[in-house]
Structures are given as C-alpha cells and as structure tokens.
Regions:
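Extracytoplasmic gating/loop element in the C-terminal half of outer-membrane beta-barrel translocons
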Residues: 116, 382-471
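Short, flexible active-site loops
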Residues: 347-348, 360-361, 373, 431-436
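Short, positively charged
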Residues: 72, 339-343, 426-428
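N-terminal hydrophobic signal/anchor transmembrane helix of membrane proteins
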Residues: 91-95, 216-220, 360, 402-405, ...
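Glycine-rich, aromatic-lined ligand/substrate-binding cores of catalytic
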Residues: 355-388
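Conserved small-residue
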Residues: 249, 268-356, 387, 396
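Extracellular/periplasmic, surface-exposed regions of secreted and cell-surface proteins
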Residues: 1, 5-309, 371, 434, ...
Length: 515
C-alpha cells in the first residue's frame, strides 16, 4: 500500500508500556548434630519476604489520516487512556526439624506462619504445620540379613498448608474513575470488598509403603486424604448489596482421597545389557462437603458445571439428548424424570455423573541399554475424563447463530431428510442446543517422549586426553495420541474445548560434552 493511501481519517494509534519487579529475600540457619553416634538431628530456621510491583499505561487515539502519522497526538478524534498499578507481598517465618535413630526410625516436623497482603488486616497471618514418621523396616535385626529384600519402608504424615491465590485487593472496598453521568465525570463503587477474607487451609494425610526386591524391582503404594476448608470462592450476592452480584469469601469444605501405585524393575540386567520397565497409576475421588450459607447447590452458568454437595466439583450439569424424532426430524431430550420430550428446558438439566477431572491417570515406560546405546519411551494416559466440545457445537449449529458458515459436512450428509431417517443430526432449521451430545470422552494414550542416545566408550575418550564424556542424542515428544475425542487435542486445560492449540510435536538433536 502507498504510504499516503486515503483511509478517510479512520487510522488509529496506541502506545502502551508495563513494568514488573519481583523481589525475594530469604534467610536460613541450619544446625546439624549427633548424640552418642545413634541420634542424628537437623534443625533449620528461616525467614522469607516477597514483594511484587507492576505498573503500566495505555494511550489510544483515532482519526490518523496517514500511516506516516504514527504518534498518538496525531489523532483528530477523542483519545482514550488508562493506567494501572498492582502490588502484593508475603512475609514468612518457618522452622523444620529432622530426626534419625540408627537409620531405623525417621521423624520430621515443620512449622510456618505466613502473612499475605491479599487479606484483611485481622486475617493476614496463617499458621501451618506438618508431622511425618518413617519406619525403615529393612534395617531391623530380623530383616537386614534377608538378601532378597532390598527395601522395606512404611511412612505416615499429616499436616496443613495454606492458599492465598486470589486477585489483589479483593478484600478492599474500591471506587474507580472514568464514570460519566449526565456529562459529568466522577467515580463509582467498583468493588464491595471483604475485610474478613483469610487463608484457605488444606489438611493432608498420607500413608506410604515402599518395597524393593533383589536390588532390581521396586513397588510403591500411597494413600491420601485431603480436606480443604475456608475455600476462597466468589459467592453470589444481591446486586443491591455489592453492586457486582458476588463477593469473595471463605466458604465451604471439599475433600479429595485416592491411591497411587507405581512399580519399576530391571527385567534383564547383565554387564552390557539392561531392559527396564516402569508403570504408575493413580485414582482420585473429589467430593464437595459444604458450600455457603446452608446452600447445597450452585450453578456455574459459564462452564456447564453445577456445584452440589456430595458430588465432584467438576461434574457436568446438562440436558440429556435423546436423539432425533424419525417422523419429523425434531430434536428430542429426556426430561428430569427420564421421559422423552421435544421441549428444551433449563429445569430438565441433571447431574451427568461425568467429570472434567479424570479419576484415573497414569503412565508407563521402558528403556533398553546396550553398552553405550540407550533407547527409551515414555507414555502417559488419562481415563474417564470428559470435555464439552464447543467447536462441534458451532460446527453443527446450522442456522442457530444466524449464519451457516464453517459447518460440519455431517449437516449435509447425516442430517434428517425424510420421515423414517434414523440419525442424530436434526432436520435443517432446528435450533441446536448445548446438551450432553457435545460432552465427549477425552481419555487418551500419548507417547510423551521417545529418545535414542549413544555415549562413546571411555576407552576411546581416554585416548583424546581431553573429553571425559561424549553423548550424542535425539528425542521426540508427543509423537502420537490415541483418543476418541473429536478435537485437535484431548489434553486441554479447561472443561470446554475451544480450538486450543494442541501439544506440539518436538524433535531435538544434540551433543553433550564433558571435559
């Protein structure tokens, strides 16, 4: 385009800038000592302070008549500007102690107190603790001589931790500028605040059993129970009270419990060749125990989720699709009682029993080593996880949104056309509703990493009198995925798929040298 092309004075120009600085100061003191050669102690005291500050501005104007006039001041029409700043800080004091008796019994404890600027002045400090104990059964007199048992440990722990991850300043009542009423500039109340905001707390309990055999096979079992209380949530409130329709509060109780299993071992191990396999699997159950003010259910209208006491917080709340009426091509749904109807009603939504957070997940891998050559592969999988495919909803919407662009070819080939057609795509002209037909199983199996490397033998490197290690390697990530999900990638970070970029395939070649 010519530099002075006519644009009828519709050009725009903007300038923006932002700066952020994060300062962290940490001081620790550590003391180790032993008594009678059998009691070992390790004590640490510490303090940490964190301060974050950011500020920025933006200026925007309209009416530039040439692309050579790039300054904001060259605009002939009204400009708009905005600036912002944000700060938060933490202050922490902590201590940790460890005890070891003859490498048979181990104990540890920790205690910390933290202050966050994100809470009201009377609730900024939170105190958290942990206790742990481990019994090294293998070191007992009756097991230490058993050569076939290389590891036997039992561990238990309990403790609390805190969470303060909410936006800055939400404990404050704020006003904002830029308001205009009857051509008079002024301020308006933009946030109601809550000086009672404080730390969210999680109480965690763990049990672990670790076994090893013949110095080549290892098993691990862990069970846990976590209870989170005083959760930081946006609680709905009347607009007449807050002006926003919600307020941040400490409410509710949520529980998670589950198990984790892992195993690895050398199937074959000789001087020159080793074949190792490993696998892990975990199961987690999430349940909401309490909400707020005696409320037992709350609908999150933007996510298709409904928080119901006794259910998972990631369970979908949707209408159930019953297919297409073969006589006339109309959409059908199940009502709340399971009867088929051609009316779509919000009141017929039900808890589906399907969740975004997968209860089952795990991985497995194998590696081969022959002299300096090594090949390894790592897989990951997720089971029984569901995601709303929002792309499919739009691609099969027909005329729902007033346009028929970018539609799936299923609307052409698979839709209902005449009485007697059996299909799940309704006749043309039906208004598509967001229901559980678009709730897809996003379980998958993925090859996360494949690597091949070769290390030159030491006998050759010694002759160079220069290199102590030379390793040539190549690796690939995310080579393939097995899934029934219709989107580009089942491993999305939210419960709604909206054409997010899939995990990229990555290939790496390299040489590692040591001198």
């Amino acid at each position: 385009f010519p530099s002075l092309s006519s644009n009828h004075g519709q050009g725009t120009a903007a300038r923006q800038s932002s700066d952020a600085i994060n300062l962290t100061e940490t001081t620790t003191a550590n003391y180790r000592f032993t008594l009678n050669d059998i009691h070992s102690f390790n004590v640490m005291l510490g303090q940490e302070a964190v301060n974050f500050h950011s500020d920025g501005f933006q200026v925007y104007s309209k009416g530039q008549t040439s692309d050579l006039l790039t300054n904001v001041s060259s605009g002939t029409r009204a400009s708009r500007w905005a600036d912002s700043s944000s700060d938060y800080s933490y202050l922490s004091f902590f201590m940790r102690g460890e005890y070891n008796y003859k490498e048979l019994y181990y104990a540890d404890f920790s205690l910390r107190t933290d202050a966050s600027s994100r809470f009201g002045k009377d609730h900024r400090w939170g105190t958290f603790w942990s206790l742990g104990f481990m019994y090294n059964v293998k070191s007992t007199d009756w097991l230490k001589d058993m050569k076939w048992l290389s590891t036997a440990q039992i561990a238990v722990s309990t403790g609390t931790s805190g969470n303060s991850e909410i936006p800055n300043y939400y404990h404050l009542a704020l006003v904002s500028g830029g308001a205009n009423y009857d051509n008079t500039a002024g301020f308006y109340p933009s946030q109601s605040g809550n000086e009672e905001l404080g730390w969210e707390s999680t109480w965690a309990n763990n049990f672990a059993l670790r076994l090893g055999f013949l110095d080549r096979i290892n098993f691990s079992f862990e069970a846990y129970y976590k209870r989170t209380s005083n959760m930081l949530m946006r609680v709905p409130e009347s607009y007449t009270v807050t002006g926003e329709g919600y307020r941040w509060k400490n409410v509710g109780v949520m529980a998670n419990k589950g198990i984790e299993l892992s195993a690895d071992g050398d199937v074959i191990r000789t001087r020159d060749f080793t074949w190792n396999v490993s696998a892990n699997v975990s199961y987690n159950q999430n349940r909401l125990k309490e909400l707020y003010n005696g409320v037992t259910e709350y609908v999150n209208s933007t996510t298709g989720l409904k928080y119901v006491v006794g259910h998972s917080v990631s369970e979908f709340f949707l209408n159930r699709y019953a297919g297409v009426n073969p006589a006339n091509g109309e959409q059908l749904w199940y009502d709340k009682n399971g009867n088929v109807t051609n009316e779509f009603r919000e009141s017929d939504k039900v808890m589906t029993g399907k969740t975004y957070d997968a209860p089952w997940m795990g991985g497995f891998g194998t590696s081969f080593r022959w002299k300096g050559l090594q090949l390894s592969a790592q897989f990951s999988w997720i089971g029984t996880r569901y995601v709303i495919n929002n792309d499919r909803y739009f691609e099969e919407s027909g005329v729902t949104f007033g346009t028929a662009y970018n539609q799936s070819n299923r609307l052409l080939y698979d839709r209902w056309k005449q009485p007697g057609d059996i299909t799940d795509i309704p006749r043309w002209g039906e208004v598509t509703q967001l229901d559980d037909r678009f709730l897809e199983n996003a379980s998958f199996l993925r090859l996360k990493n494949l690597s091949l490397s070769y290390s030159l033998p030491q006998s050759l490197l010694r002759k160079t009198n220069f290199f102590s290690m030379v390793r040539i390697y190549g690796q690939a990530q995310n080579l393939f995925t097995v899934t029934g999900f219709n989107g580009l990638d089942p491993e999305v970070s939210s419960n709604i798929y909206q054409a997010q970029y899939p995990a990229s395939r990555q290939f790496t070649l390299g040489v590692e040298l040591q001198f």
